[in-house]
Design a protein with these regions (language model features):
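Amphipathic alpha-helical segments of tetratricopeptide repeats
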Residues: 39, 96, 116-117, 132-137, ...
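Extended alpha-helical scaffolding segments used for macromolecular assembly and cargo binding
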Residues: 72-153, 162-166, 441
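Structural signature of alpha-solenoid helical repeat junctions
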Residues: 74, 94, 100, 107, ...
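"A position-specific structural signal for the A-helix of alpha-solenoid helical repeats
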Residues: 81, 94, 114, 149, ...
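Internal alpha-solenoid helical repeat scaffolds
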Residues: 139-314
Length: 450
């Protein structure tokens, strides 16, 4: 009987280790039971020397038995214990899964807030979308952090009306709070973050917004959450926002905005100004070799005091300048070394864009087999489910399709991006999109290419 109960209580979980088995079952002899099961039965399989799972047919039977025997309250308690185990390990994705299955909305809210602080930037919202969407509206309206998250999430889903609605709710929340109220200060901080970060806002007002937020910071009226300036892309000028309009006055903006920008962005601002002006000059066709030589020594400071986003932006610019000066092998090595380093550090959200960048280098050097391998194994290829965070990969995918002589596939890949490019003033992405579309039309002998 104790073994049977032990099995039923672990059935909801795909895999587990000894510590989790002990915590979920509450059985101090969990180690002995696992040892007995491994020795005398074939119910358990090893994931590795620490983790186990039931074979799928047996787990399905156990779950059926558990549904039959355990009350809903008891099942929810098991999920809550599993959620607590993952929470203590700071594995918030699995913890959220458990708490959602157990219907514990307050824990889901709490973890979403905590996870947003641990993993800043727009990528977090896309990963956590289903948990945000599962929360009751009243729960979201009670939390400035969750309203901020919903506003950004709607923007990333290209629901700009929904995004502005949640921005308005957050604004109303801030107005209801007093100037000294901690919740009011948090709401004003989140509004300032959205004013800078929302993709549909463009960059036109940022030259006024950033100094205004800088003054609020200096007066300790707001404390800003972390940003993701690049959205895990190898660029600042075409990262979270398109800053190409600033390129005309880059020297003036560098002198006037450098200090406010670095103060407002905190860790995200380390190395940003120097990388941004070097990239601006590069995009205008100027020689940036000298600027790169002064920028590279800052990489250590970026690693120690900054963010991996900026590290990728600097390395991405270096690789592009190496490619432009006829050193494709060096460009490939720059990205490969960084990819290995990021993989070791568990920074997996950058890897898909790094792989896409390596694919572009392969096409530049004529290694079409490698480009086709990326297309088969890693390209998004999901025209009906647009994720704007993958736009760099969509454009790379279209390049491979052109290379393979498939102009219809190019149009299918690029068409969903057009509304995003227009609504969010993405000038550089728009140039890439229009050039690739024009080439595809030309190859089809369609006069619209003009």
């Amino acid at each position: 009987l104790p073994v049977r109960r032990f099995l039923l209580e672990l059935a909801p979980f795909e895999s587990f280790d000894l510590e989790m088995a002990r915590m979920v079952s509450g059985d101090p002899r969990a180690g002995e039971r696992l040892d007995w099961l491994l020795r005398y039965t074939t119910m358990l399989r090893y994931d590795d020397c620490q983790r186990f799972h039931f074979w799928s047919g047996f787990r399905a039977f156990l779950r059926w038995e558990m549904e039959r025997e355990y009350t809903e309250e008891k099942r929810k308690a098991l999920f809550s214990r599993g959620g607590l185990y993952y929470e203590l390990k700071e594995d918030y994705a699995h913890a959220l899964e458990c708490y959602t299955s157990g219907g514990d909305h307050s824990k889901v809210s709490e973890l979403l807030v905590r996870n947003a602080e641990l993993h800043p930037g727009m990528g977090h919202y896309a990963e956590m979308e289903k948990y945000y969407r599962s929360l009751p509206e009243a729960e979201i309206l009670a939390s400035p952090s969750l309203m901020q998250g919903m506003s950004m999430l709607c923007a990333l889903a290209m629901d700009y009306e929904g995004s502005e609605r949640w921005y308005g709710e957050l604004q109303a929340f801030a107005e209801r709070c007093g100037r000294q109220d901690a919740a009011g200060k948090q709401a004003r901080s989140r509004l300032a973050w959205l004013d800078i970060s929302l993709p549909q806002r463009g960059v036109n007002g940022l030259t006024e917004t950033i100094p205004a937020v800088f003054r609020l910071l200096m007066n300790k009226e707001v404390t800003l959450p972390s940003f993701s300036v690049t959205s895990a892309l190898p660029s600042i000028m075409n990262g979270g926002k398109d800053f190409s309009a600033w390129s005309k006055k880059d020297d003036l903006l560098y002198k006037t905005l450098r200090l406010p920008v670095e103060a407002v962005l905190g860790r995200d601002g380390v190395g940003l100004a120097d990388c941004a002006i070097a990239e601006s000059k590069f995009e205008k066709g100027e020689d940036v070799a000298g600027r790169m030589l002064s920028l590279l020594p800052q990489l250590n400071e970026v690693r120690n005091r900054g963010t991996p986003d900026m590290e990728f932006a600097v390395s991405g610019l270096l690789a592009r300048s190496q490619l432009a000066s006829g050193q494709p092998a060096d460009a490939r090595r720059t990205i490969e070394v960084l990819r290995e380093c990021f993989a070791e550090r568990g920074l997996t959200r950058f890897l898909p864009n790094m792989d896409a960048m390596l694919c572009r280098i392969d096409m530049h050097t004529g290694d079409l087999d490698a480009a086709d391998a990326w297309y088969r194994e890693k390209a998004p290829r999901e025209p009906t489910h647009l994720n704007v965070m993958r736009r760099y990969q969509y454009l790379t995918q279209a390049m491979v399709e052109l290379e393979d002589g498939r102009p219809d596939a190019v149009q299918l890949t690029l068409a969903p991006l057009e509304p995003y490019v227009q609504n969010c003033a993405r000038i550089i992405d728009g140039i890439h999109l229009n050039v690739l579309t024009a080439i595809a039309l030309y190859r089809k002998k369609d006069e619209r290419w003009r």
